[in-house]
Amino acid sequence: MIRLSPSRTLKALLTCAMLCFGALSHAQQLFRVTAIPDESPTELARKAAPLLKYLEAKLGAKVEFTPVTDYAAAVEALVNKKVDMAWFGGFTFVQANVRSGGKVIPIVQREEDERFRSVFITSDDAIKSLVDLKGKDLSFGSQSSTSGHLMPRSFLLQAGLNPDKDFRRVAYSGAHDATIAAVASGKVQAGALNISVWEKFVTDKKFDAGKVRVFFTTPPYFDYNWTVHADMPAAQREKLTQAFLSLSRDTTEGKEILDLQRATRFVPSKVDNYKGIEAAGRSAGLL
């Protein structure tokens, strides 16, 4: 039998305690996630719950959703490292990238986000094309929304309509579902929003489809992504990326998460995907 001196025994015990404490601390690490509030808080929480549980298992850390009040707060939260990962629209990513001096990294996006679109909706039978909007009331979503403001504004400008001059009134509802509600209730005659929220409302029959219809669908553009701060360790960033890329519709868990995220699958993303949106933002005077 090997006998240790009291000093060596104490040293061994302290080493063991430090290792155990380190393992415990690692297990109790908090990984914070946020998302732009492009839908109601209850809907965002419902969509996030299974994904957070999945990420907890993959990362070996407690994953917590941190809600924010507006798009700007989501940008500031990631730029200032108050959260570890954020769900951004294309334009909010650009804002975060500019605000941080290039210190944020888009890791994944849905396959759908490689060719995302917006829709213009109306309850007015006389509106059949974008040019028919002249002199009407129009609602965008948030001013920082890619699919609910920036890209619809860009396509209006391409059609020869200046939202700041050619409409009777321009409103900002703050969220895609709120835009649908504004059009359905008659508060505005038309609205622009994210196609995936529109399709979900149609599928779930959340409004009278006989009253509100799509009259214009935009050409495709890059949109949403999951973004992290560049200071995140490369190993953790890779683990996180692989967790998303591993999601599969072949498993019950994967199908549930992908359905809630309205995704076929997740694919790698990169900064260059959003150069077009950055150019549109600068052209519109929003950057």
Indicate where each model-derived feature is located.
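N-terminal signal peptide c-region/cleavage motif recognized by signal peptidases
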Residues: 22-24
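Bacterial N-terminal signal peptides that target proteins for export
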Residues: 2-14
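Acidic, polar ligand-binding/catalytic clefts
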Residues: 76-132
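Short coil/turn segments
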Residues: 38-41, 45, 112, 121-127, ...
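Short helices/loops that flank or line small-molecule/ion binding pockets
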Residues: 72-86, 99-100, 131-134, 175-196
